[in-house]
Amino acid sequence: MANSRNKNENKVRFDLNKKMKTLNFGKLIIGGPQTIIIAEIADSHNGSVEEAKKLVLAAKEAGADVAKFQIHLPDIEMVAGKVQMWDGDLYEILKRNLFTSEQHKEMMKYCEEIGIEYLCTPFCPTAVDVLEDLGVKAFKTGSGEITNLPHHRKLAKISAKTGKPVIVSTGMCTWEEIADTVKVYEEEGAKENLILTNCTSEYPPNDYSHANLGLIKKLETDFGVIVGQSDHTMDNYTSYAAVALGAKIIEKHFTLSRQQKGPDHFISLEPAMLKDLVDGIRKIEVALADKKSISKEEQTVRDWAFHSVVSINEIKKGEIFSIDNLIPKRPGSGIPAKFLDQLYADELIGKKAARDLPANTILSWEDVAK
């Protein structure tokens, strides 16, 4: 059949020996040692620029790297009156809360003034044009756009031409649908600018098992792109785990109060929770160091906690050392106890004592005859 497709046709395998490229997003580096933390404001400003500025400032003060918005053109995005949300008709909600291009421009300027990157999600190709005209530094798409390949084709063309990163959420879709989207970016020469975020499009997920954090590594290895986590859980545990598993971006909805009216407020982090998220992630990043060495603080413990070779009874000068007259004991200030094991025993066992050794003496190498 013309529409049939081999399950693995679009799958792209990543060479694990190849170093992952980092991407520049304004002053930020995506894919580097520091996780990029996105405060997803979305439409939680309720159509107010002043409220939006309060949100951006609060996100900045909490330590977020990015303030993310959404740009809606409802008449182009959707058919009116067809989608009912828990807060009313979606079309009407979008019309009521949307920002004009001038208002987005004002928010971009404000973000720049206070030192936080501006990011925005377009929901149709026309909105992509608006954002490109505004001079955005990157794009972010929602999970609902994953099968809108013309939308992604346009973003991919822009990305290939400009080098701008495109962050794509992967909630509520199949692996094959993700592969199709990746293929679009590959065909347009923009795959190296693509970031995929693992996501569950539940608000919030009703079980932690739905987070599917194991997909973080699978997305990276199958598609060879930088991977993040768009997290809709009500707390920070999933995000912490995602960072430990290699997520380079964490996105969480953000509000000044969960008590506000609107579709996203109740699942969003409040300022104190966002600060906890940032602080926790920064600590985890440090804890993920992979250089094995003995710290100064560890050495203090090592000195007493490790074991030395100790004489069981009195040993006379010239007497042969054996496992019958030596034993491992703390502290670790003498000959290491490993020299009593067969791996190293030939360097000590069978040698002669260089002096008389009282019982319970911690041996040093000076006590071993040359």
What are these regions (language model features)?
Residues 5-370:
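Catalytic cores and adjacent flexible loops of soluble metabolic enzymes
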